Amino acid sequence: MSKKLSLEERLSLATKKGRKKNKRSTSNLSSPSPVVLSNNEQESARTSIDDAAAGVVSIDNAENIDDPAVRSESTVEGDTGKADSIAVDDVVHPDHNRTDCFDDTMVSLPTWLPKNYTEFTVEELVKEISPEYLRLNKQIDDLTNELNRKSQIETTDSSFFKLIKEKDDLIDQLRKEGAKLAETELRQSNQIKALRTKVKDLEYEVSELNDSSAQSVENYNELQSLYHNIQGQLAEATNKLKDADKQKESLETLEKNIKEKDDLITILQQSLDNMRTLLEKEKSEFQTEKKALQEATVDQVTTLETKLEQLRIELDSSTQNLDAKSNRDFVDDQQSYEEKQHASFQYNRLKEQLESSKANWDSIEYALNTKIVNLENRFESTMKEKNDIEEKYQTALRSSETLGKQLEKEKENHSKAVLEVKDLERRAETLKSSLQSISDDYNLLKKKYEIQRSQLEQKENELKPHQENSNEKIIDKIPVELTDSLNSMEGNIEDEWTLPQENSMLSLSMSKLGELESDPSLKPIYNESHETICSEESQHFDRKNVDFSIDDIPEEAAALQAIREGESMNSLNNTSIPYRRASVQLSNSNGHISAHLVNKLSTELKRLEGELSASKELYDNLLKEKTKANDEILRLLEENDKFNEVNKQKDDLLKRVEQMQSKLETSLQLLGEKTEQVEELENDVSDLKEMMHQQVQQMVEMQGKMR
C-alpha cells in the first residue's frame, strides 16, 4: 500500500472481507457449517478491531503532530505501523491476496462508532468503544468455544493449527514486549518521582534561602542606617577634632609661654632670694650703722652738754668778772658787753641746733622703726604666700601624677580594644574561609548536577524512539491480545493503569534517597520565587498525575546502566505479573509528560541557578559592606576614644594653665610689691645716709665754729 488508509476505509474493507469470506464458505460447503461461519465471523471481527485500533493510532498520531518533538517521530511510527499491520494481516490470511480487499464502493461506518470520533481524545474514544468492545469479546469467546468443540472433529486441517501456533507465538511476543514496556514505564515513573522529590527539596531550600536573604537584607538596611548615623557622628567628630587641633595648638603656645614664665619665675625667685640676702645684709649694716650713729649722737650730745655746762660756767664766771670789773673801766664794759652778747647769741644758736637735731633724730628713728615693722610684716606675709604657693604646687604635682596613672589605664584599655579588634578580624577571616569552602562545595555539587542532568537527557533521548516503536508494534498487535486482556478487565478502565506495588522500584528509590541524603557535599540551594514555583509545579504534577524524585538519579552513567539492568532482570524474573493493555496509551502520554517535565525542570533549574548566582553575589556584596561597616565602626570608635582622651587632656591642660596663670599673677604681684619695697628701702637708706652725712657735717661745722 502506497498510502496509509484512514479509519473509515479500514472499517469498510474489514466489512467487505467478512462478506466475501462468508460467501466463499457457503459456496464451498454443501451444508452450512457453523464452524466455518464462526471462523469467518471471528476473522472479520478481528480485522475490524485491528482496523479500529489502527484508526485509534492514526488519531493519536494526528493529535501528537502538533507537538514539534513528536512530529518527526510520527512519520517513522506510521511506516512501522504499516509494516506491522501488513505482517499481521498476512499471518491471519495467508491464503488470500491483498488485492481482493479493495473495492470501488465505500461502506458506511459501524453504528456503534460515534460520528464525532475524530474530536475525541484517545481515552474518551476508548471509553466510548469499551461496551462494544466487551460485546465483541463475548462473541469472540463464544466463537472460540465453538471452535474448540469443532477442533476435535477437524483434526485434518493443518493450516488451522499453524495459525493457532503463530497466534500463540504472537501472544508470547506481545507479552514480552508488554513486560519490557511496563519496565520502561516503571523506570521512567520512578525517575520522575525522584525528580519531583528533588524539586521539592530544592523548593524547600529556596524558601530557606529567601528567608536568609530577607534577613540579610534587613541586616544590610540596619547597617546602612547605622553607617549613615556613624557618618554624621564622624563629621561632628572631625569638626570637634579640628577644634581640638586648634585648641591643641593654642595649648602648645600656652605651654611654651608657661615654660617661659616658669623660667622667668625661677629667675625672679633667684633674684628675689638674692634681694632678700642683700636686704638682710643691708638691714644688718643699717642696724650697725644705726647703733653707731646712736652711740655717736649720744656721745656728741654728752659732749655738747658738757660743753654747754662749761660755757655756762664760763659765762657765769665771765659775768661775775664783768660785774666785778664794771667799776673799773666803762670802755672795758662796752667790749665785754659785746662779747657777752656774741656768746649768748652763739649759745642760743647752738641750743636751737641741738633741739632741732634731737627732733630730727627722733623723727628719723620713728620712721625707721615703722619701716622696719612694716618690712617685717611684709616679709612674714610673703613667707606665708610662699608656703601657700608651695602647697598648691605640691597639689598640682599630685594631680599630674593621678592624671598620668589615668593615662596609663587608658593606654591599657586601648591596647585591650586593639586586641579585641584583632580577634574580631581573625573571626571574620575564618568566616570568609568557611564561606569560600561552602561556595566551592556548591560549585562541585552544581557540576555533579549538570553531569547528571546531561546524562538523564541523553538517556531520555535514547529511550524515546525505542519506546515509540514498541508502542506502535503493540498497538498493531492488539487484536491478538484481546481475548486475554478483556478477561482481566474488572470495573473501571481508569483504575487499571497502575502496576502491582510489589514489583515497583520503591526499595531501590528509597535506598538511593538514603544515600543522597547522607551525602555531605549536598548543600541548600536558594531561590526568591518559591511560592510561584510551588504553585506551578503542584498544578502541573496534579494535572499530569505523576510523582517523581531526583534522588533516584545516580551520580555516574555506569550506575544508571546498572540500575536499568537490575530492573530489567527483576522484570524478566517476574513474568507472571498481570499487566494492563491500556498501558499503551499511558506509555505515549507518559513519554510526552516525561519530555515536557525534563524540559520544564531544565528551564526551572537554569532559572534557579541564575537566581542563586545573583543571590550569592548579593550575599558577597552584603558581607563586604558589612565588613567595611564594621571596620568603619571600629575606626570611629577608636577616633571617638582618642577624641575623648584629647578632650580630657585639653581640660586638664586648661586647668593647669589657669592654675599656672594664677600662680604667675600672684608671683608677679609679689615680685612687684617686693621690688617696690626694695626700692623704698633703698631710697630710705640713701635718705638716711644723706641725713646722717648732713648731720655729721653740721656737727663738724659746729665744732669748728665752737673752736
Curated annotation (Swiss-Prot):
Composition bias type Basic and acidic residues, residue spans: 1-11
Cysteine-cysteine disulfides: none
Residue list for modification N-acetylserine: S2
Keyword Phosphoprotein set for record: yes
Further information: Present with 300 molecules/cell in log phase SD medium.
Family to which the UniProt record says this protein belongs: Belongs to the SGM1 family.
Described purpose of this protein according to its UniProt entry: Required for normal growth rate on galactose and mannose.
Name recorded for this polypeptide: Protein SGM1
UniProt gene name: SGM1
